[in-house]
């Protein structure tokens, strides 16, 4: 019999899951009864999300992880494996704290640019290397949270758009490399109501009208119901034949993929 979401127990880890889309993914996976590890710097916030996972029928855990610190991702993966004995999915959602801040390239110093690269790509490199053997054993998957900015570009968000486009290329290349070992690699380009999006709207008040005007559904996605459940599908066995794909979960805002 073909397995479906809810009939399988998965062990997954989500970076940057103390709020926004990361939290939404954690809660959606909790709905399926999965074991969800919240990998984050802030223990109090991470434990709070883990408690929400428990309340929804999943198994919530916090593991200390600062993706910006070399070795931290590997330590987090090792901790999870020591307690669970397996790992089925890794979600890299963490992003630079500078991501929602619109700024012209002339004002972007090298340190700020490197911060984007370090969190979006350097941490991804570390997570992928640290988790590969476990994902190979479970025939699991790696899921990256990218952005429509990586497809079409965004004025005054060039560092963010640049690393998000690079993430997509990384995912497609890794899908080809890891496919022979049964490991899937996919991406999601979300558009959701999150604290980061709200901050961006505060910095650019006209942005909200622009975003909704180009959205056929005229709304922002819900971090759990829309983005989280799409992520859960890609992490599940129901998506066992899906790899190297970027799923646009943006209400049709960026149709030209």
Give the location of each predicted region.
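Short C-terminal tail/terminal secondary-structure segment
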Residues: 2-4, 102, 152, 232, ...
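Catalytic Tyr-X3-Lys loop
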Residues: 106-125, 143, 167
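Catalytic Tyr-x(3-8)-Lys segment
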Residues: 205-225
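Amphipathic alpha-helical dimer-interface segment in Rossmann-like NAD(P)H-dependent oxidoreductases
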Residues: 78, 119-137, 175-176, 236
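Short, small/polar-rich loop/turn modules that mediate ligand/substrate recognition or access, typified
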Residues: 179, 184, 242-244
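Catalytic loop of short-chain dehydrogenase/reductase
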Residues: 96-97, 110, 141-167, 171-180, ...
């Amino acid at each position: 019999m073909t397995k479906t979401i809810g009939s399988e127990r998965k062990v997954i880890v989500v970076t940057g899951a103390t709020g926004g889309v990361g939290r939404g993914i954690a809660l959606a996976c909790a709905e399926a009864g999965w074991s969800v590890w919240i990998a984050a710097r802030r223990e109090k916030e991470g434990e709070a999300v883990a408690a929400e996972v428990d309340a929804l029928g999943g198994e919530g855990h916090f593991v200390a992880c600062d993706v910006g610190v070399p070795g931290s991702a590997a330590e987090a993966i090792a901790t999870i494996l020591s307690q669970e004995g397996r790992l089925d999915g890794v979600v890299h959602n963490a992003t630079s704290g500078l991501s929602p801040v619109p700024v012209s390239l002339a004002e972007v110093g090298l340190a700020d640019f490197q911060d984007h690269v370090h969190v979006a790509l350097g941490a991804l490199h570390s997570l992928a290397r640290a988790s590969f053997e476990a994902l190979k054993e479970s025939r699991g998957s790696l899921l990256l949270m990218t952005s429509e900015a990586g497809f079409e570009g965004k004025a005054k968000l060039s560092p963010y758009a640049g690393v998000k486009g690079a993430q997509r290329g990384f995912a497609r290349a890794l899908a080809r490399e890891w496919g022979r070992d049964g490991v899937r690699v996919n991406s999601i380009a979300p558009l959701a109501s999150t604290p980061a999006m709200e901050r961006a709207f505060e910095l650019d008040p006209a942005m909200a009208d622009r975003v909704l005007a180009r959205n056929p559904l005229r709304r922002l996605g819900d971090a759990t119901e829309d983005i989280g459940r799409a992520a859960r599908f890609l992490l599940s066995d129901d998506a066992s034949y899906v790899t190297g794909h970027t799923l646009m979960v943006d209400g049709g805002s960026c149709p030209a993929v």
